[in-house]
From Swiss-Prot:
It holds the Pfam family DUF520. It comes from the Bacteria. Nucleotide-binding protein. The keyword Ribosomal protein does not apply. This is Nucleotide-binding protein Sfri_0732. InterPro entries: DUF520 (IPR007551), UPF0234-like_C (IPR035571), UPF0234_N (IPR035570), YajQ-like_sf (IPR036183). Keywords: Nucleotide-binding. GO terms for molecular function: nucleotide binding. NCBIfam families: PRK05412.1. It comes from Shewanella frigidimarina (strain NCIMB 400). PANTHER family: UPF0234 PROTEIN YAJQ. Belongs to the YajQ family.
Amino acid sequence: MPSMDIVSEVDEEELRNAVENSRREVAGRFDLRGKEIEIDLKDNVVTLKSEDDFICKQLVDILRIQLSKRNVDPSSMEVDEKAVHSGKTFSLKVNFKQGIDSLVAKKLVKAIKDSKLKVQAAIQGDSVRITGKKRDDLQAVMRLAKESELGQPFQFDNFRD
């Protein structure tokens, strides 16, 4: 019986590459030259530091663009509401969602069951296991998951026939 897992993960290597590319772009931009800017990545959290709140927002946009270029879905970003001011710098933290939390998993399973497809959906930790009789049903679930607006990108693993 065909089965697959629906997961939500960010490729750490691509994330690191996007952060490095963001640093290079900031170093080459004329409007940001001479400003104190730091972009740090640690444990799937990117810290953006600059002299100005507006520049922090520009750094978030630069990071989004670089993530898109590296095929990492920017909707996995959780940006802090407000930049934290400490001393003469502003800092913003950008977290990346790893795994599907239980509330999103329940909504996804409900959407799959409401679609009347002949598949079984089971929540397994931070992923959702889908089992069905036909490969076409699993592909329909893939389409449904990609089209659902649950605020999180989904990837598909362990596709077995």
